[in-house]
């Protein structure tokens, strides 16, 4: 009954080779859930002066993790709003899950805005609460 979750933060100084290596290792480990976070530099922290990754780098990373981990739930997570900007909807072509409404250190996209974005793309929203409702009704 347990599932595994292990993720990454894109933009902390890793190379393309580093990303390929971690994507392959997470595949080898058969991780069930793979959150892909994007560096959101915060002033006063060790990486506070580092520029965040751009949209193209973020989308490439999501595509890499999707292609190397086809059975995993790829979760576009922290920093996606800032780093992807207007390209954020494109993340859903590689990711099949979003984190919304707040991360550990930064606010996140509001749930209603995320649902609207998903609807505009023609995707369906599934939530743990909706799944629980279906189980209770059976």
Provide a role label for each language-model segment.
Residues 1-6:
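Radical SAM/AdoMet-radical enzyme domain recognition
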Residues 24-138:
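Auxiliary Fe-S-binding modules of radical SAM enzymes
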């Amino acid at each position: 009954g347990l599932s595994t979750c292990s993720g990454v933060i894109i933009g902390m100084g890793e190379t393309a080779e580093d990303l390929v290596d971690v994507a392959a290792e997470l595949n080898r480990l058969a991780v069930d859930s793979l959150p892909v976070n994007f560096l959101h530099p915060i002033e006063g922290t060790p990486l506070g002066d580092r520029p965040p990754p751009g949209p193209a780098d973020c989308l490439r990373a999501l595509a890499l993790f999707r292609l190397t981990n086809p059975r995993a739930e790829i979760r576009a997570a922290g920093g996606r709003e800032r780093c992807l900007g207007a390209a954020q909807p494109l993340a859903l072509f590689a990711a099949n899950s979003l984190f919304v409404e707040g991360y550990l250190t930064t606010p996140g996209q509001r749930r209603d805005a995320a649902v609207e974005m998903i609807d505009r793309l023609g995707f369906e929203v599934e939530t743990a609460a909706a799944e629980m409702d279906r189980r209770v009704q059976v």
